[in-house]
Amino acid sequence: MNRMSTIFLKIALVLIGIPILALCIFLVPKVANYSAELFPNIAYIKYLVFIYLYVTAIPFYFALYQAFKLLSYIDKNKAFSGLSVRALKNIKYCAVTISIFYAAGMPVFYLMAEIDDAPGIIVIGLVIIFASMVIAVFAAVLQKLLKEAIDIKSENDLTV
């Protein structure tokens, strides 16, 4: 892969991270306040939602960082190394973590949708869960293929 492709992908990673950062800055406080309005009898719900949404952003940004590292390994011609396998494994774990967090939060999504009569809230939660699982499965497949390619490469290096 030429350097221009990896530069494009690195820019794409940054452009993926910026809107999520904007959502964390501007939308998360509004969602937390909105949840406090929906559930006035639960005083701490605002802070739980606030912390919960920020905690789910941590594995997202860690996965972006790992993808950035993976592209750097490709630039350095270290794509077929244990470092790349480890980066893919970390991306897989981050995607699974995001799915678990949002699956655990689905009852709150359901309650918010029920009170507000907006089923789109549930759909948003499901899209996040399934997109994260697709990324996890894709990363797992790539991890396995890369590990097999590394094994084949090391076997070929030994036979020469």
Swiss-Prot record:
Lineage of producing organism: Bacteria, Bacillati, Bacillota, Bacilli, Bacillales
GO cellular component: plasma membrane
Location in the cell: Cell membrane
Listed name of the protein: Uncharacterized membrane protein YoaS
Keyword Cell membrane: yes
UniProt keyword terms in alphabetical order: Cell membrane, Membrane, Transmembrane, Transmembrane helix
Organism, as annotated: Bacillus subtilis (strain 168)
Origin superkingdom: Bacteria
Transmembrane segments: 7-27, 48-68, 95-115, 121-141
Main location: membrane
UniProt membrane topology term: Multi-pass membrane protein
Any Pfam family the entry gives: DUF2975
